């Protein structure tokens, strides 16, 4: 359940090389364009990587088409997207680095307890970037900003797994 919140982590930008204001703006504006598509985002991740779906007890072993339109699926998708939205909103401002670090560290700790691997975080990242690149204006500048944000996030999360 929180696995995708963890995956949401994929959107920070705080530590090793903080996002510039321009990079943060690119991440924030592209996220704003899709963040209302919670169910579609989670469905895209599950479709691309069924092993991630199987980390969620309420969705494990079920056909994606049969769960996609359920309240439970929508609720969980909203939790994940809300987490990502919070982290993204905090990015680009050095005074928020501690808050981002706390949120993302907790995400790593929570997902370690669930047996989520660094490889699965990588899968989530791949699926999220694929979704974004197909649903927002995606150029080299946007791709670079997202990659930097996700690299920063993973620098916090992966060592905690």
Curated annotation (Swiss-Prot):
> Where, in this chain's numbering, is heme b bound?
76, 111
Q: Which GO terms describe its molecular function?
A: heme binding; metal ion binding; oxygen binding; oxygen carrier activity
Entry-linked SUPFAM superfamilies = Globin-like
Q: Does the keyword Repressor apply?
A: no
Which part of the chain is the Globin domain? Answer: 18-161
One GO cellular-component annotation of the UniProt record comes to:
hemoglobin complex
Concerning InterPro entries, the annotation shows:
Erythrocruorin, Globin, Globin-like_sf, Globin/Proto, Mb-like_M
CDD domains, per the entry: Mb-like
What domain of life?
Eukaryota
Task: Kindly indicate where the leader peptide sits in this chain.
Answer: 1-16
Keywords, sorted A to Z: Heme, Iron, Metal-binding, Oxygen transport, Signal, Transport
PROSITE patterns, alphabetized: GLOBIN
State the similarity comment: Belongs to the globin family.
**Family annotation (PANTHER family):** GLOBIN-LIKE PROTEIN
Q: How does it assemble?
A: Homodimer.
Further details from the record:
There are at least 12 different components in Midge globin. There are at least nine genes for VIIB variants.
Can you say what this protein is called? Globin CTT-VIIB-8
